[in-house]
Amino acid sequence: MPRVLNLLVLALAAAIPAQAQEPRLGTIDFPTAAAPTAQAAFVRGVLYLHSFEYASAAAAFQEAQRLEPGFALAYWGEAMTLNHPVWNEQDRAGAQAVLGRLAPTPEARQVRAPTDRERRFLAAVEQLYGDSGS
């Protein structure tokens, strides 16, 4: 009998839709100049980032980059996944490498951001990870 019960539990678990296993991250309004598909991946990344799910956030931001390679805030987001202030951890070199994939210098990265708001987010991440260390 326990074997039948185990099989029944396994069958029921397999029948649960995959979306039920997706975490409940909430919603945000974070407008950008990105195309809708890249925007959706970006928003998912921000939601994961705000839930301290750094690996999932990085994957979502990388998906946004794949969908729209020039999407500046997707690189901003991936760089932000390398800052873990709660644990006093920061991968500055890794974040600089992420930003370097967008463009080689802070000035060149600023040009890639199409709106003032997006340029300000990039300026903030440059301050966080910049050469001054401040």
Give, region by region, the residue ranges found by the protein language model:
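Bacterial N-terminal signal peptides
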Residues: 5-15
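Residue-level recognition of tetratricopeptide repeat
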Residues: 37, 70-72, 116
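Conserved structural position within tetratricopeptide repeats
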Residues: 63-66, 104
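Inter-helical turn/loop elements of alpha-helical hairpins
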Residues: 53-59, 78-112, 123-134
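Canonical tetratricopeptide repeat
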Residues: 41, 75, 116-123
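Repeat-mediated protein-protein interaction surfaces in helical alpha-solenoids
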Residues: 20-33, 105-107
